[in-house]
From Swiss-Prot:
It comes from Listeria monocytogenes serovar 1/2a (strain ATCC BAA-679 / EGD-e). GO terms for molecular function: cadmium ion transmembrane transporter activity; manganese ion transmembrane transporter activity; metal ion binding; symporter activity. Coiled coil: none annotated. It holds the Pfam family Nramp. NCBIfam families: nramp (TIGR01197), Nramp_1 (NF037982), PRK00701.1 (NF001923). The chain crosses the membrane at residues 41-61, 69-89, 117-137, 147-167, 176-196, 215-235, 270-290, 307-327, 363-383, 384-404, 424-444. InterPro entries: NRAMP_fam. Its main location: membrane. H(+)-stimulated, divalent metal cation uptake system. This is Divalent metal cation transporter MntH. Keywords: Cell membrane, Ion transport, Membrane, Symport, Transmembrane, Transmembrane helix, Transport. The gene is mntH. The keyword Cytoplasm does not apply. It is found in: Cell membrane. Residues 1-10 have a biased composition (Basic and acidic residues). The lineage of its organism: Bacteria, Bacillati, Bacillota, Bacilli, Bacillales.
Length: 448
């Protein structure tokens, strides 16, 4: 009986897998076999941090700053709901990778026709380039704020971090995870310090985590709320997570997969909770520093930087803010380039040298950023940042819907298939995200 189940699971894929996802690091991180719970958990920790990076990239900053400065603490509940959706989707992505041994790109390539698979690849690449644009812009703005480096040169300098990724991956996947975790802690500490300096209203913060009807009835508030939701769940993260969970040397047996799914869920939930704290801190800072002082129209990251020192009365407030921004941009770079490699290998089975793949992704992100900066300066950069988030919104459903399809398919997942209650919730979330992003796209196009 068990053998029959295995055969049916194998037959649900149209073709054999050519190579594992991210083959150079696949199954490379040792898991102690007879260790106690916390030692095993420590070995599994890491992929969640790489995923959480996508939830605190520079693209998220703009929506949180706008929400806090214009509406105070009210939209904290939206950040909380977004995080709950993220935990659900990331748990599905990691389960897909652990159970099937395929990442989301490989699974999509196998399931769909070649023409449709090619379309999905193009959309995934556009999402990764859009993500990289946000990271390039965030890092360039941070370099400008900290060191006075012109934006156009800051954009070009960001190309150098490709070599950091290559060096770390050569040293071992754990090194990438350690750097990412260090930068995440840096961002959290920076915003923790900013919050202390801003003296927020704790009672208003607690109330902000309770959803208010005003979020739906106020069109301006609803638009920013949808922007927060749309910018939180990143499509490239679903491809990335389904791949990097396979870096662990868990037993590829029923019990081994069950254990890996459990530890992966703890890892990603913990890391996404840190991301929640960071995003909430950004909104709280904007509410305390700007909303309560009557500055309701803080247009972007640079405006927030300039206003922090005089508003909080501290000479280091803006510097700490810029350091956090630089850490955010660099962190996102590390994960975005890995995602690019995953989708190209998964959809097209093209295995470029890592340096070529990373240079390709970065060049495609830097070129539009350089052109816009040269022609329109800082205002153009902010517009490009917003446009990159629109591109991400358009692509998200093309990653979420296949993910829910595959994890709800008994032939593909066997006994690990989503139970009925999870299928219902997952499809409801997928439909909600699709409707949300159609609305966001329509609103953006009609307001041009």
């Amino acid at each position: 009986m068990k053998k029959d189940k295995t055969e049916r699971t194998k037959q649900s894929w149209r073709k054999a897998q050519n190579a594992p996802s991210l083959s150079e690091v696949n199954n490379s991180v040792a898991i102690p076999k007879n260790a106690k719970f916390f030692r095993k958990l420590f070995a599994f920790m890491g992929p969640g941090a790489l995923i959480a990076v996508g939830y605190v990239d520079p693209g998220n900053w703009a929506t949180s700053i706008a929400g806090g400065s214009e509406f105070g603490y009210t939209l904290l509940s939206v950040i909380l709901i977004s995080n709950i959706l993220a935990v659900l989707l990331q748990s599905l992505a990691s389960k897909l990778g652990i159970v099937t041994g395929r990442d989301l790109a490989q699974a999509s390539s196998d399931h769909f026709s070649k023409p449709f698979g090619f379309v999905l690849w193009i959309l995934a690449e556009l999402a990764i380039i859009a993500t990289d644009i946000a990271e390039v812009i965030g890092s360039a703005i941070a370099l400008n704020l900290l060191f006075g480096i012109p934006l156009i040169w800051g954009v070009c300098i960001t190309a150098l971090d490709i070599f950091l990724v290559l060096f770390l991956q050569h040293k071992g996947f754990r090194y990438i995870e350690v750097i990412v975790i260090t930068l995440m802690v840096t961002i959290l500490v920076c915003f923790g310090a900013e919050m202390v300096m801003s003296h927020p209203d704790m009672q208003a913060i607690a109330k902000g985590f309770i959803p208010q009807s005003e979020i739906v009835t106020n069109p301006a508030m609803l638009y920013i709320a949808l922007g927060i939701l749309g910018a939180t769940v990143m499509p490239h993260n679903l491809y990335l997570h389904s791949s990097i969970v396979q870096t662990r040397q868990y037993a590829r047996t029923k019990e081994g997969k069950k254990e890996a799914i459990r530890f992966s869920f703890i890892d990603s939930t913990f890391s996404l909770t840190i991301a929640l704290l960071i995003n909430a801190s950004i909104l709280i800072l904007a509410a305390a520093a700007f909303y309560t002082t009557g500055q309701h129209n803080v247009a972007g990251i640079e405006d927030a930087y300039k206003l922090l020192n005089p508003t909080l009365g501290s000479s280091i407030a803006s510097t700490v803010f810029a350091v956090a921004l630089l850490a955010s941009g660099q962190n996102s770079t590390l994960t975005g380039t890995l995602a690019g490699q995953i989708v190209m290998e998964g959809f097209l089975n093209i295995r470029l040298k890592p340096v070529v793949r990373r240079l390709l992704t970065r060049v495609l992100a830097i070129v539009p950023a350089v052109i816009i900066t040269a022609l329109y300066g800082a205002n153009g950069i902010n517009e490009l940042l917003i446009f990159s988030q629109v591109i991400l919104s358009m692509q998200l459903s093309f990653a979420v819907i296949p993910l829910v399809m595959f994890t709800s398919d008994k032939q593909k997942m066997g006994e690990f298939v989503n139970p009925t209650w999870l299928k219902i919730i997952s499809w409801a979330v997928a439909i909600f995200i699709a409707v949300l992003n159609i609305y966001l796209l329509f609103y953006t196009l009609t307001s041009l």
